[in-house]
Structures are given as structure tokens and as C-alpha cells.
Amino acid sequence: MSDAQQPSEFEPTSVADDFEAVDVFPSTEDMDLRPGADNCYKCTSCDTSCPVAEVDEDFPGPKFQGPEQWRLKRHEDVDIDDSILSCSNCMRCDDACPSSVPLSQMHNTARGEYVEEHMDKLSIEYLRNRMLSNYRTMASIGSKVPRLSNFVMGLGITSVLGEKIMGIPSERDVPEFATETFRQWWKKRGGSTVSNPDKQVAYFHGCYSNFNTVEVGKAMVRVFEEFGYEVLVPKQQCSGTPMFANGMLKDARREAEVNVRELGEAIDNGAEVIASCTSCSMALRQEYPELFDIEGIEELSEHTWEALEFLRVHEDMGQAIRESEVDPQAFAYHAPCHARNQGLDRQAVELFRELDGVTIEDVGDSCSGISGTYGWKSEKYETSMKIGAEMFEHMEHAEGDVGMTECPTCAMQMNHGTGYEIRHPLELLEEALV
């Protein structure tokens, strides 16, 4: 019988009859990511994209810390490697992976396990990381007497002691507290000047726009009101981003529970959630549903937007910008890694190139290096600056001598490496439209 002939008794079978789908990510709080590791076929795209691996030859990279470690844990009880603490949580590996392996989810879970099981809770490193992770708590105290806090934190001796005692690099300038927090301003203002039940947004301002860069929060409110939106400012906690990066998952869950509940009420009443910080929007959209099983968490993820993104989707921003004009100014724009992960990396450049009076240049796709609290650790400072070197160079060769970014810690790094003033896109949008 030739190869082309078929046996008369042959009966094809349906794959669907025998196939049973495997739920690799069961919906449980105790998530086992080991099956998901099998989607990795070791192409090393994640390692190539990793900014830490590029400058630190001792760092094994995201492939090892993610799928390879989970594969090992499938076969034997092995400890999480301590190199997980060198991951900056930039999440660029998520975007790089062609197989959609949940790398950052694996890293966050592994880091949480390492901190919980292996880190000495009385060590200076743990206490320092806990303090950095809970910036909102520290800022709540410092902002009660902002002028005194700024004076004390600006003293040279404070920087020296901070490095020697807590491991916070003395090279860094501690950001100043605003003399009035955003929420204090909001209360004094009497809330939104627009009443429109059909166009409501709930503003998730995050920690930094509340305590430090209050003008960003004010700009967000004024711009959205200009488009007829009623702005709500619900009760809220930290997004949890610095807690994820430091393995403080219990702290992050505590904050997430409040945010899901409070923002969920606004969503139930028809509002969309708006964040002015791309790391905050990333946390609410991606990290919350990946790491926690909280009622309403998926709804929050689905209804969260970055501010500029929301306006570009729901309003005719192109026409509004083309009809506006500002004084001549040139910007060097850096897209935060967490903006890239959400597909938002060029939106500010595309928008403001249409604004009369503005020259804006994208300074490339490199990481700033600071990665939230990462660059605020003495042992990571040099690595942070090596990662940021490419961005600094591109900024200095750009036409503009004012930087622009959506991320507050990227703004710190940009200013630290170049001395440039750094602005948020919402501030320029307010200048153009309000």
C-alpha cells in the first residue's frame, strides 16, 4: 500500500474530544506560576531587554529569575536566589517576551517569597526597604511641617547620616514637600468646579502628586474640567508600586484593598479612574489582578486610564492642540518603562508636536535607571546611574534643555543626571488649553 493510500478502517478522531484545557493560572491567592514557565522557550529576549543585566555582569537576568527558577521549584524545594533583589521591577521583560510569559508577575511573587522567608526583619536593609516602600506614611508625617522637614532633609549631615545608617545614597537630593498637599488644596477649593453626572472621572493622584509635585495634580483637575468632566478625588492609599519592587506584598495588599473598594464605588457610579503617574496606572491595571484576588479588582483594572491616554481616546485632542499656542519652548521627552508597557510611550511626543511653539524630541527607549526606590539604595546607586547614562547623553544632545516625563522618579533621575528642569505633560497641556 502506498503512502498516499489510507486504510479503509481509518476513522479520524477529534482532538477536542480528548483534549482538556489546563488552567495554568488558577484563580487563587496562592498562585503557582510554575506551569506558566513552560511557555518560555529560552529565546533570551527578556535578558536582552533588561537594563540591569546590560550593566551588571553578575546579574543573571529575568529569564533565570522567572521561568528557570519556577521550573526548578517544580521538581525540588529550592530557595529563591537572592539576585531577585537586584531586579528593578522596570517590567520591560514583559513587553519583550514573544510568548507572553508573565515574567514580572513571577519576579514579584519570588521577591515577596524571598523577603518573607529569608530576609532578616531586623536588618538595616529590610528596615530601609520598608521605609522606602511606605513613602506615603513617611510623607504624611513630613508634610505636616513641610518647611521644617525640607530644611532638615536638605542638611549635609542628614545626607551623610542617611547613607551611613540607612544605606540611602548621599548623592541623591531628597525631594521637597509642597507647602500644601494636593488633598489640602482640593478640600480648600471645595472639590470640582464642574457638576456633570454623565462625565465623571475619579482621580488617583498617588503619593508624589499629593505630597511633592502638587502642580501636576492641579493641572490634571483643571485640564479635565476644561473638557467638561466632573473630577472626583476618592479616599485612596499608595498604589503599592514601591511595595511590589521591594517584596512587601502584605503591605501592598493592604493598600490595594482600600483602593479597590474606594475606587470601585466611583466606578459603580459611572466614573472612570484616571492616574497621572504611569506606574500607578500600571499597578491598578496589571499588577493588582496578577497578584491579588480581591472582589472588584478586575473591574478596577478595566476602568483605569493614564490621564493623557484617556483624553486622546475620548476627546478631540488633536484639534484642541492645533488651535492652541504657547511661548516657544523645547523639551527632551523620556518615556517611562511603565508607560512603554502600557503602549503609551510616544503619546506625548505625537500630541505636542502639533502644538504651536513647542519642539519636543524623544530621547530614546532606554531606562532612566532609577526605577522608583531602586536608585535610592546605596548598593544600587552606581548601577542606577550606569543604566541612566544613555538617557543623560541623549538628553544633552537634544535641542531642548527642559525634560518631560510622566513618572515622578524618572523625573528625579533626569534632573539628577542633567540638572534640567523636568515637567509633566499635564502641566504643558494646562498651559496650552486652560
Describe the role of every protein-language-model region.
Residues 136-140, 301-327:
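A conserved helix-loop-strand patch within extracytoplasmic ligand-binding domains
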Residues 48-51, 55, 98-102, 342, ...:
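Short functional micro-motifs and their immediate structural scaffolds
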Residues 40-46, 50, 87-93, 97, ...:
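Short cysteine clusters
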Residues 2-29, 52-82, 100-130, 420-431:
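Non-heme iron-sulfur electron-transfer modules
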Residues 1-33, 42, 219-220, 234-235, ...:
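Terminal disorder- and signal-encoded targeting elements
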Residues 30-38, 68-235, 243-284, 288-292:
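Iron-sulfur-cluster electron-transfer modules
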Residues 200, 206-300, 306, 330, ...:
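Cofactor-cradling patches in redox/metallo enzymes
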